[in-house]
Amino acid sequence: MAQHETDAVIVGAGPVGLFAVFQCGMVKVRCHVVDALEAVGGQLSALYPEKPIYDIPGHPSILAADLVERLSEQAAPFAPTYHFGTQVSTLSRLDDGRWLCGLSNGDSIAARAVIICAGGGAFGPNRPPLDGLEQFEGTGVFYLVRKREDFRGKKVVIAGGGDSAVDWAISLSEVAAKVMVVHRRPKFRAAPESEARLKQLAETGAVELVVPYQLHGLEGENGTLSAVVVATLEGETKSLPADVLLPFYGLSSDLGPIAQWNLGMDRNLIAVDPATGATDAPGIYAAGDICTYPGKLKLILSGFAEAARVAHSAHDVVHPGEALHFEHSTTSGVPKG
């Protein structure tokens, strides 16, 4: 069990957490970063690394994985210490005013400031209730697309009617041997332009729409999927030859220990002062999707601005009484970590 000391602990290594490392470094606040996943990037890396993002300033389009890589490179000069595959399970105040973060792996970190950038908390897919599902998970059933090329030449069944299902059906139609989309109703819940594109592909035969049907069963052996059985609400079934099933039924999230930290929760979000990012607890701040305040916009762009705000707030508790002389990065450059 290792004991660490630093200026600030950042909870979450997603895009906002990574940018918080950079912003803290710019104001001479050293950071340790804790994330339950095994690498940086949060949902961008774990769920849709190859999906394009369109609302990052200066990037008409950038892949999620590329954005994570650049944010990580931007934070690197400040030499943050990462703690992957663990979470902050306990948070307590020390006699000297610092916060002690107890990690689930037994380590601990003492810091003047804690910055929570945990998004929606720990997350996982909503799994379809199918007999024998477990034997195909990781071999024929996947809940995310890491690399589109993994599906080249394969028969792919996509289940769901939201943006993820529709967007991936469109994308995978370019590489898969066949794409079938199973949805329990003819109308989809995706962006209108995406739904229109999907129907165009269906008209040309590039995608097959299997509606109104829902998942009913799986066929195969030794972890190798051979078919997906679907059924109507009336019980009529049919078998779809398939190599892969991608159920896109959304995610369930859990704040875990964060919900027990008495930080002024508001519908599973942390209420903060919009001027400082401060929570109800002194020295604890929040940024990104996990925080809320009047007029909050849940955008990565907003999270970046909040990361800058909380970094400046953290400076005041890490270096009390030390005036922060603000300079634009074009003037100051990037200090060494």
Curated annotation (Swiss-Prot):
Binds 1 FAD per subunit. Keywords: FAD, Flavoprotein, NADP, Oxidoreductase. This is Ferredoxin--NADP reductase. The keyword NADP applies. FAD binds at D35, Q43, Y48, V88, F123, D289, T330. Its EC number is 1.18.1.2. InterPro entries: FAD/NAD-bd_sf (IPR036188), FAD/NAD-binding_dom (IPR023753), Fd--NADP_Rdtase_type_2 (IPR022890), Ferredoxin-NADP_redctase_2 (IPR050097). It comes from Paramagnetospirillum magneticum (strain ATCC 700264 / AMB-1) (Magnetospirillum magneticum). GO terms for molecular function: ferredoxin-NADP+ reductase activity; flavin adenine dinucleotide binding; NADP binding. It catalyses: 2 reduced [2Fe-2S]-[ferredoxin] + NADP(+) + H(+) = 2 oxidized [2Fe-2S]-[ferredoxin] + NADPH. Belongs to the ferredoxin--NADP reductase type 2 family. Homodimer. Its cofactor is FAD. It comes from the Bacteria.
